[in-house]
């Protein structure tokens, strides 16, 4: 259990890290619409953007700060006073300050020494704190940083006034075992303040690493709806929340039933479709075609489902196709209000399998056509 807490907080960065996805650019009204949906869903902290990027970005963050009623609104800021000023002018509740701590970033991106990085942390965190807002400090590329120096950077930020700290896996190189070690290492050496974890998905490990961090002492999960974000994306809000709830038995403030609609909204405004096999919110997440599976699910859904689809706003789908069996056909016919006689079931099953190999999707309209042809005594040796 993270830091003795039973409730894990959710920090959503869909409007900042998510929007950094190539090809995505949200208008002010679109950012506000997503922010309001995040607030309604129960997100604890909303990173609304990066105020120093542009006047429009600052305006959007300021509007979100005004309109959001429950969640804390956050702006990202580099370790500079001008970035802090821009964030403060956006009337945020929290400023998220970051600076890289890995040697590769210090040398090739910032061109500074470790000592200079510590000096900037002390100076700018203290300056930001003078605005009277909460301060979150991130050590960018923490997971490729020297551990002793990393701990020193966090201690410097905390002593300068940081209220919370974040551990970013900036290029997604962690494994669960390494993440467990890192979180324990930091917990043993730092004061017991809230610790965030921010995982990227370059190796497909973002959710697993986030959940592992929570199991080993992190209090706050930084996430993005639909796994969106730059490169391979970030830990998916819906997957982390479901895992925390169903697998760890811990609570969040998220209304689970809002997950599907939130996913759909973000997909629409980002212009990026949700993969059908996406966990929790994908169209296929609770879809069943294989006859054995359908039989089990119709008798007891938990035979092939780890959670109830309606609990996360999704729904169960029984799909007719190449792998369907009699139970699927009977269920589908009853849903149409058609009495499933043995002859009709056999006819439909044969038709479905023939159509499937022709890549024909057997939806409700096609199924009705199959039934009509059966009633007229016609064969199914044609493509619908």
Swiss-Prot record:
Catalyzes the condensation of the acetyl group of acetyl-CoA with 3-methyl-2-oxobutanoate (2-oxoisovalerate) to form 3-carboxy-3-hydroxy-4-methylpentanoate (2-isopropylmalate). It comes from Pyrobaculum aerophilum (strain ATCC 51768 / DSM 7523 / JCM 9630 / CIP 104966 / NBRC 100827 / IM2). Keywords: Amino-acid biosynthesis, Branched-chain amino acid biosynthesis, Leucine biosynthesis, Metal-binding, Transferase. The keyword Transferase applies. InterPro entries: 2-IPM_HCS-like, AIPM/Hcit_synth_CS, Aldolase_TIM, LEU1_arch, LeuA/HCS_post-cat, PYR_CT. Belongs to the alpha-IPM synthase/homocitrate synthase family. It is an enzyme of class 2 (transferase). This is Probable 2-isopropylmalate synthase. One of its GO terms (molecular function) is metal ion binding. Its cofactor is a divalent metal cation. Its EC number is 2.3.3.13. Homodimer.
């Amino acid at each position: 259990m993270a830091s003795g807490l039973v409730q894990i907080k959710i920090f959503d960065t869909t409007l900042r890290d998510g929007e950094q996805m190539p090809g995505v650019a949200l208008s002010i009204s679109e950012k506000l619409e997503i922010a309001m949906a995040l607030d309604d869903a129960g997100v604890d902290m909303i990173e609304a953007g990066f105020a120093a990027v542009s006047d429009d970005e600052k305006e959007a963050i300021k509007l979100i700060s005004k309109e959001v009623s429950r969640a804390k609104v956050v702006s990202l800021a580099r370790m500079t006073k001008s970035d802090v000023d821009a964030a403060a002018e956006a009337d945020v509740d929290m400023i998220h300050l970051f600076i890289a701590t890995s040697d590769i970033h210090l040398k090739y991106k910032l061109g500074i020494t470790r000592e200079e990085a510590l000096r900037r942390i002390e100076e700018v965190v203290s300056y930001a704190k003078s605005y009277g807002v909460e301060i979150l400090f991130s050590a960018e590329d923490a997971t490729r940083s020297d551990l002793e120096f990393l701990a020193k950077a966090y201690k410097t930020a905390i002593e300068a006034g940081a209220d919370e700290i974040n551990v970013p896996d900036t290029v997604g190189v962690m494994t669960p075992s390494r993440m467990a070690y890192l979180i324990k290492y930091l917990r043993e050496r730092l004061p017991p303040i809230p610790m965030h974890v921010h995982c990227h998905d370059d190796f497909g490990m973002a959710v697993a690493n986030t959940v592992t961090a929570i199991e080993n002492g992190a209090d706050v999960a930084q996430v993005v709806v639909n796994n969106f974000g730059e490169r391979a994306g970030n830990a998916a809000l819906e997957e982390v929340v479901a895992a925390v709830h169903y697998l760890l038995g811990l609570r969040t403030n998220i209304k689970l039933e809002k997950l599907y609609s939130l996913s759909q909204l973000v997909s629409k405004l980002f212009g990026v479709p949700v993969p059908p096999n996406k966990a929790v919110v994908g169209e296929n997440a609770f879809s069943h075609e294989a006859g054995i599976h359908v039989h089990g699910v119709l008798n007891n859904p938990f035979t092939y489902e780890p959670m109830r689809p309606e609990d996360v706003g999704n729904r169960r789908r029984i799909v007719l196709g190449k792998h369907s069996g009699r139970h699927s056909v009977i269920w589908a016919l009853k849903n149409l209000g058609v009495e499933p006689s043995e002859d009709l079931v056999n006819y439909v099953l044969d038709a479905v399998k023939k159509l499937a190999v022709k890549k024909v999707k057997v939806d409700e309209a096609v199924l009705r056509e199959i039934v009509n042809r059966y009633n007229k005594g016609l064969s199914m040796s044609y493509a619908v």
